[in-house]
């Protein structure tokens, strides 16, 4: 990558729109907790296809982590990407703040996220509150872009043309304090 093409997140600004891309499941993070829930707490049957899953639990747990490079390239050719983050261990609350400059925060609305059933099962089995789930797992969103509000439609179109199913998650707003606020939590 040429130095002038590096996306540093420095361009993230008030009013930017946050666009999320679906995860393929748990991804490669949170497995210490997942193992504890599956083997110690729930004593789940790895061969069983639980409600909401379309394959046995063991296959769901081993679903490979998505790589988002094609989406990044498709989007950067159409609009200026102000920021991006991969939702890994630490969920929304640790990863989104990494792309947000001081004096700004992300306000997230989860209503349009297609939450994979594996997260519902883990939450039910371990009786974990929803805020903690968003603090630990990707909850169905594996990658997030920040783009200018004026570029929102072009960004969504470019991502859809690249075979993605993007969802608008929220906006960057001005304010001090928590860098990630999820409505309703």
Positions of PLM-derived features:
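Short, compositionally biased
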Residues: 31-42
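Glycine-rich anion-binding loops of enzyme active sites
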Residues: 1-31, 171, 183-185
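Glycine-/charge-enriched secondary-structure boundary and capping motifs
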Residues: 44-47, 51-185
């Amino acid at each position: 990558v040429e130095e002038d093409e590096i996306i540093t997140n420095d361009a993230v600004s008030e009013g930017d729109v946050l666009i999320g891309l679906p995860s393929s499941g748990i991804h490669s993070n949170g497995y210490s907790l997942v193992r504890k829930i599956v083997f110690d707490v729930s004593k789940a049957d790895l061969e069983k296809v639980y409600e909401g899953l379309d394959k046995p639990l063991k296959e769901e747990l081993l679903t490979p982590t998505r790589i988002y490079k094609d989406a990044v390239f498709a989007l950067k050719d159409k609009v200026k990407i102000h920021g991006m983050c991969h939702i890994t261990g630490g969920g929304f609350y640790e990863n989104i703040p990494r792309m947000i400059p001081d004096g700004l925060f992300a306000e997230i609305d989860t209503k349009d996220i297609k939450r994979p059933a594996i997260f519902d099962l883990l939450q039910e089995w371990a009786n974990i509150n929803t805020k903690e789930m968003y603090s630990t797992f990707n909850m169905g969103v594996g990658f997030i872009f920040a783009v200018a509000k004026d570029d929102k439609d072009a960004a969504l179109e470019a991502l859809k043309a690249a075979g993605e199913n993007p969802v608008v998650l929220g906006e960057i707003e001005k304010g001090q304090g928590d860098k990630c606020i999820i409505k309703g939590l």
